[in-house]
Amino acid sequence: MDFPQQLEACVKQANQALSRFIAPLPFQNTPVVETMQYGALLGGKRLRPFLVYATGHMFGVSTNTLDAPAAAVECIHAYSLIHDDLPAMDDDDLRRGLPTCHVKFGEANAILAGDALQTLAFSILSDADMPEVSDRDRISMISELASASGIAGMCGGQALDLDAEGKHVPLDALERIHRHKTGALIRAAVRLGALSAGDKGRRALPVLDKYAESIGLAFQVQDDILDVVGDTATLGKRQGADQQLGKSTYPALLGLEQARKKARDLIDDARQSLKQLAEQSLDTSALEALADYIIQRNK
C-alpha cells in the first residue's frame, strides 16, 4: 500500500472512530452537537491520527486499541481549529473549503462545541476499551494529552502567537511559538501511539520525540510557505491570512528559498532519528513517508 492509500485508509478509520465516540453523546440533533460533528468530521488530513496509528502499529498494537488515542488527539485538534477561527482569535471564515463553525452555527455554538470536543478527548482516553493498554499507560496517555493541549503546549503557543501579532519576532522566538502551538500536539500523537505499546514503546520515546519535534516544526514551516505560494481554493482556507494578521513567518524571516531549505533539513533530521529504530528491526516506513509528505503537500 503506497502512502496516499495509507493516508486514505487512516482518514476512513479515524472518521469511523470519531463517529463512534460522538454518536452516544446526549443532545443529538441539537446545534451544539451538529457543530461538533461538522468541526470534527468534515474534511481534514488526519495527520495526527495517522501518527498514532503508524507509531502503534510499528510496535504491533492493534487498530482497535489505537482508535481511542487517534480519536482523542483529533478531538483536541478539531477543538483548537474551531476556537482558532473565532473572531477573537484569527477571525477566519473558511476552513477546509467550507464556512468555519462560528460562521455556520454562530459563535456561541462554536465555543461550546470546541469545549465539548476538548472534554470528549479525555472521556475517550479514560473510558474507551483499550485491551492492550495497562492502567499505568492509560493514565500516562491522559497526562500526555493534557500537557500537550494546555498552557504548557498548544494553548501556550497560541497565546504567544496572538501576542506576537504585528511585532517583529526573531527566529528563536518564532520556533518557541510553533514548538508549542503546532509541535506539542504532533509530539503527543506520536507519544500516544508509543504509550499504547507499553514498555517497548516507552523505551523508544527519546528517539520518537526527536522525530516528532522535527516534523512538527517542518509542518509549520511548510504551512507558512503555503500561505505565501498557495491559493485559497487549494488550501481550503484564506491564502495570505498570516500576512494580513501581521504574523512573523519563516518565509518573512528567512526568505522563501531558505524557508524551504529549513523544512527539508528538518525532515532530514526526522529521518535520521528513525534510523535508530530501523536498526532495532522496527518498520519505520510509514513514519518516513509521513515526514516526506509534510513538505510535499500543497494544502
UniProtKB/Swiss-Prot annotation:
Subcellular location: Cytoplasm
Superkingdom to which the source organism belongs: Bacteria
Binding annotation for (2E)-geranyl diphosphate: R95, K181, T182, Q220, K237
UniProt GO BP: farnesyl diphosphate biosynthetic process; geranyl diphosphate biosynthetic process
Enzyme nomenclature, EC number: 2.5.1.10
Cofactor binding, per record: Binds 2 Mg(2+) ions per subunit.
Cofactor(s) in the UniProt record: Mg(2+)
Top-level EC class: transferase
Catalytic activity: isopentenyl diphosphate + (2E)-geranyl diphosphate = (2E,6E)-farnesyl diphosphate + diphosphate
SUPFAM superfamilies linked to this entry: Terpenoid synthases
PROSITE patterns recorded: POLYPRENYL_SYNTHASE_1, POLYPRENYL_SYNTHASE_2
Amino acids binding isopentenyl diphosphate: K45, R48, H77, R96
Gene Ontology CC annotation, any one: cytosol
GO molecular function annotation: (2E,6E)-farnesyl diphosphate synthase activity; dimethylallyltranstransferase activity; metal ion binding; prenyltransferase activity
UniProt KW DNA-binding keyword: no
Residues given in the record as Mg(2+) 1 binding sites: D84, D90
NCBIfam families: FPPsyn (NF045485), PRK10581.1 (NF007877)
Family: Belongs to the FPP/GGPP synthase family.
Protein's UniProt name: Farnesyl diphosphate synthase
Originating species: Escherichia coli (strain K12)
